[in-house]
C-alpha cells in the first residue's frame, strides 16, 4: 500500500501551489498531483509573459514570474509532486481516500481539488484553412520575437486587450472585436483607447489570405453592414477564450453546479474530507480570480486539518506570529 498523506492537492496551478505551502505551515504531510508535465497551470503554460493584475502587491508580474515565486516558496518544504498524472477516480475508505490516477494509486486522509477550469483548449478561429498557417497563434511564448512586426489581435476580453497593449509597445498593432464595448477591465479599456492600437469595431474576421503557409492579410467584415477591410499582417493572435473540460470530475461523486464543484463556507464539497478552491469551485457570489483562489486555499487547508484532527482549531495563529 502506498504512503498515507494528510492532504493531497489535485492541481498544481497557483492555488494548488499556495495551498501546498500553507498546508506545510500547518505541519501537514502534503502531495500534489497534476495532469500537466510542469507546475504552474494556465499562467505557466498559456500566458507566461502576460501581466497578471489581480495579485496584491505586484504591478508587473507575469505568469511565469508568479509561477516561479510560488514554486520557490513551496521549495521551503519537502513536497511529493506527481506530474503527468490524470486523476481517474476517488474512492472513500476507512482511513480517508484512495485516488486512482493514470499511473498509480495514492492514499490520503483529505483532498483539496484546485484544478482550475480543468483541461483547457483555446477556442479556435473558424475560418477555412486557419489551422494550416504557421503565423496564427493562440498564446505567446516570447513577445520580443514580434518586435517591429504587424500584429493583429482578435477578441474583446481581458486577454485580448492586455496582449494588444503589450504588443503596442514593440509592434504595429490592431485589435478586432465584434462589439463596440469590451469585456476587459475598465482601466485596461481606457488605456487601450488612449494607446496607438488601431481598434476595429464592430468587425469580425471573414477570410484569411495567405501564401507559402503564412497569412498575409485578414479580411474583416462589419457586423451589421456591408463594409469590409483587408488588414496586412505578419502575425495573427486569436484570443477568444478557452474551452475547458473537467474530465472525470463528474464521476467523483461530488455535487456540481454547471461543471463546477459546489462548496460551503469551509470550501468543503458534498463529500466530507474533500475540499475545493480556485476556479474549479462554485458558491453564491463567487468571483473567478487568482486572488480569490489564493484566499480560498488557506480556508480549505485549515478545515482539512480540522477534519483530520478535530481537536485542532480551524483558525490557527496568524502567519505573522508563527
Swiss-Prot record:
On the tree of life, the source organism's domain of life is: Bacteria
Which Gene3D superfamilies does this one have? FAD/NAD(P)-binding domain (3.50.50.60)
Task: Name the enzyme's class.
Answer: oxidoreductase
One Pfam family hit: Pyr_redox_2
Give the note describing cofactor binding and stoichiometry: Binds 1 FAD per subunit.
Q: Which residues cross the membrane?
A: none
Q: How does it assemble?
A: Homodimer.
Q: What is its EC number?
A: 1.18.1.2
- Required co-factor? FAD
The UniProt keyword set, sorted, is:
FAD, Flavoprotein, NADP, Oxidoreductase
The catalytic activity, as recorded, is: 2 reduced [2Fe-2S]-[ferredoxin] + NADP(+) + H(+) = 2 oxidized [2Fe-2S]-[ferredoxin] + NADPH
Q: What is this protein called?
A: Ferredoxin--NADP reductase
Q: Which family does it belong to?
A: Belongs to the ferredoxin--NADP reductase type 2 family.
Q: Does the keyword Cytoplasm apply?
A: no
Check the record and name the HAMAP family matching this protein. Answer: FENR2
- Molecular function GO labels: ferredoxin-NADP+ reductase activity; flavin adenine dinucleotide binding; NADP binding
Amino acid at each position: 500500500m502506498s504512503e498515507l498523506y494528510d492532504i493531497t492537492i489535485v492541481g498544481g496551478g497557483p492555488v494548488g501551489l499556495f495551498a501546498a505551502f500553507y498546508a506545510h505551515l500547518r505541519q501537514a504531510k502534503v502531495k500534489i498531483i497534476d495532469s500537466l508535465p510542469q507546475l504552474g497551470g494556465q499562467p505557466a503554460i498559456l500566458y507566461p509573459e502576460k501581466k497578471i493584475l489581480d495579485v496584491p502587491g505586484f504591478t508587473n508580474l507575469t505568469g511565469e514570474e508568479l509561477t516561479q515565486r510560488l514554486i520557490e516558496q513551496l521549495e521551503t518544504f519537502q513536497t511529493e509532486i506527481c506530474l503527468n498524472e490524470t486523476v481517474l477516480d476517488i474512492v472513500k475508505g476507512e482511513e480517508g481516500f484512495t485516488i486512482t490516477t493514470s499511473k498509480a494509486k495514492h492514499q490520503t486522509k483529505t483532498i483539496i481539488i484546485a484544478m482550475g477550469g480543468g483541461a483547457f483548449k483555446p477556442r479556435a478561429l473558424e475560418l477555412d484553412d486557419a489551422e494550416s498557417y504557421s503565423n496564427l497563434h493562440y498564446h505567446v511564448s516570447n513577445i520580443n520575437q514580434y518586435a517591429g512586426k504587424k500584429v493583429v489581435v482578435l477578441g474583446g476580453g481581458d486577454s485580448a486587450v492586455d496582449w494588444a497593449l503589450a504588443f503596442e509597445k514593440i509592434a504595429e498593432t490592431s485589435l478586432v472585436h465584434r462589439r463596440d464595448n469590451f469585456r476587459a477591465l475598465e482601466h485596461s479599456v481606457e488605456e487601450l483607447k488612449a494607446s496607438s492600437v488601431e481598434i476595429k469595431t464592430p468587425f469580425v474576421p471573414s477570410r484569411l489570405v495567405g501564401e507559402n503557409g503564412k497569412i498575409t492579410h485578414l479580411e474583416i467584415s462589419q457586423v451589421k453592414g456591408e463594409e469590409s477591410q483587408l488588414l496586412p499582417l505578419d502575425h495573427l493572435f486569436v484570443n477568444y477564450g478557452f474551452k475547458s473540460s473537467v474530465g472525470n470530475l463528474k464521476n467523483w461523486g461530488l455535487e456540481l453546479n454547471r461543471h463546477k464543484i459546489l462548496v460551503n463556507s469551509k470550501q468543503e464539497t458534498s463529500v466530507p474530507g474533500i475540499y475545493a478552491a480556485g476556479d474549479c469551485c462554485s458558491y453564491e457570489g463567487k468571483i473567478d480570480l487568482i486572488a480569490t483562489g489564493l484566499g480560498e486555499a488557506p480556508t480549505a487547508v485549515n478545515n482539512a486539518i480540522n477534519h483530520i484532527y478535530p481537536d485542532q482549531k480551524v483558525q490557527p495563529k496568524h502567519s505573522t506570529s508563527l
